[in-house]
Every structure is written in structure tokens, then in C-alpha cells.
């Protein structure tokens, strides 16, 4: 077990979430080259902080501090929304473990999943949060996963079975929905 020995309080006085989520120089050569030569186009778009904030501002203020509320990002990319959601939950008094346990997401590209996990760890470190890194990784591996969201059962948090996918396809053909 790896225990992070930072203080228990988030020092948001010196932490700037807008700077942390800045993607103005995001299309680095490394990132662009990871997508070159791939067999499929991902049509990735990484949401700038201003849009992330504007969308998250639409969430009821009381939801951020409610430990029973869950947040789901069906295509989390590099984690812009996920990181902001976790940060905002922490700012509203939710502990790190609950913030992670109530945040779910699906992403098609495995490298983006790894990047998101790493960004969350960096967020915790930057905020000086005392957390268990192994436990945090276990939660992220369960809740922030790599899969095609079209074949993911969000209600039961698992992939659809082949039979379920056939039933869904059949229903779409007969009802158009």
C-alpha cells in the first residue's frame, strides 16, 4: 500500500484549476504521433476549461456537496470533465475516496484512460491530499474504464452481453429507437 503523506487539507489558495486544466498546448508532437498510423480515426476533441466550467456550472450547487450524487462522463477523453468534477467535489467538502467512488466514466482510447488516471493522481498531489494511491487506482480501474460506450450497460456498470446487444439491435430495427 502506498500512502501519500501530504496534509489532509486541499490548499486551493495556491492551486489554480484553470491552469491545471489548460490544454492550449495540448496537441504536442507526442500526442499527435500517438494517433498517426492508427487504423481508425478517433475524431478526438479535448474540451477547453472555459467550456468545462460553463457546463459544470449548470449542475445544482447542492449536488457538488452531496455524497450520494454520482457523476457519469460517457466519453471522458483525457479527463477534462472528470478532473474538474473531482476537484469541485473536493472543494465542496467531499473526501477524495467518495469523490472517486461517485465519479464514473467510459473512454474508448486506453491511453486516454491512463492519462486521466494520472491526472487525478497529480490533482490529489497538487492539492496536498492525504490519500492511498493503491486504493485510488483500484477505484479508478473500476469506475473510469476503457470500453466502447455504445456497448456499455451504464445501469449495471458492465459491458452488454452478446445476447443483450442482439436484443437492442432487434428492438431498434422494429421500433426505430
Regions found by a protein language model. Give the residues of each.
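SAM-dependent methyltransferase catalytic region
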Residues: 2-177
Amino acid at each position: 500500500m502506498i500512502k501519500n503523506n501530504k496534509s489532509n487539507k486541499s490548499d486551493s489558495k495556491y492551486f489554480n484549476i484553470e491552469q491545471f486544466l489548460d490544454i492550449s498546448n495540448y496537441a504536442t508532437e507526442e500526442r499527435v504521433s500517438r494517433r498517426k498510423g492508427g487504423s481508425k480515426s478517433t475524431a478526438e476533441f479535448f474540451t477547453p476549461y472555459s467550456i468545462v466550467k460553463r457546463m459544470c456550472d449548470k449542475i445544482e450547487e447542492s449536488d457538488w456537496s452531496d455524497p450520494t450524487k454520482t457523476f457519469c462522463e460517457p466519453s471522458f477523453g483525457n479527463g477534462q470533465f472528470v478532473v474538474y468534477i473531482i476537484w469541485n467535489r473536493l472543494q465542496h467538502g467531499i473526501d477524495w475516496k467518495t469523490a472517486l467512488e461517485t465519479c464514473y466514466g467510459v473512454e474508448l482510447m486506453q491511453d486516454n484512460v491512463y492519462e486521466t488516471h494520472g491526472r487525478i493522481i497529480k490533482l490529489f498531489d497538487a492539492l496536498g491530499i492525504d490519500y492511498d494511491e493503491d486504493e485510488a487506482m483500484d477505484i479508478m480501474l473500476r469506475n473510469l474504464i476503457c470500453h466502447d460506450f455504445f456497448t456499455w450497460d451504464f445501469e449495471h456498470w458492465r459491458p452488454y452481453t452478446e445476447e443483450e446487444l442482439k436484443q437492442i439491435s432487434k428492438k431498434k430495427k422494429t421500433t426505430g429507437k
